[in-house]
Amino acid sequence: MNNIYVSSQNHVFDPLDYVNAVPAERVAQIHIAGHTKYERFILDTHDHPVIDPVWKIYQRAIERCGRTATLLEWDDKIPSFEEVHREALKATRYLPARESRKLEAAVAA
């Protein structure tokens, strides 16, 4: 999702149009990550938390594809496990309500 966001900003296109054009039945896994802004461009560096516009793209992907394996990529400037875990759990907000509550209960146990 971050790759789509970064490309949409650098090449000026609507990221939701891109997501809507992907054949949902072909999606096996979704990757989310943060990025870094360098002057006029954004680089997919996987070294920051996921920003709200990327979560919005993720939300649309989940709406189209349903519950899909999701990987949080964080490859540099890695914070504590607790912070990475909190960031990964944000993905549950975008699951259908019943699935989200079930997953949150399992994680809390």
What are the residue ranges of the model-derived segments?
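Acidic/histidine-rich catalytic cores of soluble enzymes
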Residues: 1-41
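A short, acidic, amphipathic alpha-helical segment used as a generic capping/interface helix at domain edges
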Residues: 14-21, 49-64
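Short, well-ordered coil/turn segments that N-cap beta-strands
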Residues: 26-28, 65-68
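Catalytic core of soluble alpha/beta enzymes
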Residues: 31-42, 61, 74, 81-85
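Short, glycine/charged-rich beta-strand-loop motifs at protein surfaces that mediate ligand recognition
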Residues: 43-49
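Conserved active-site loop/cleft motifs that coordinate metal ions or position small ligands
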Residues: 69-75
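Extended recognition/assembly regions associated with phosphoester-bond processing machinery
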Residues: 77-82, 107-109
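C-terminal helical cap(s) of enzyme catalytic domains, especially alpha/beta-barrels
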Residues: 81-104
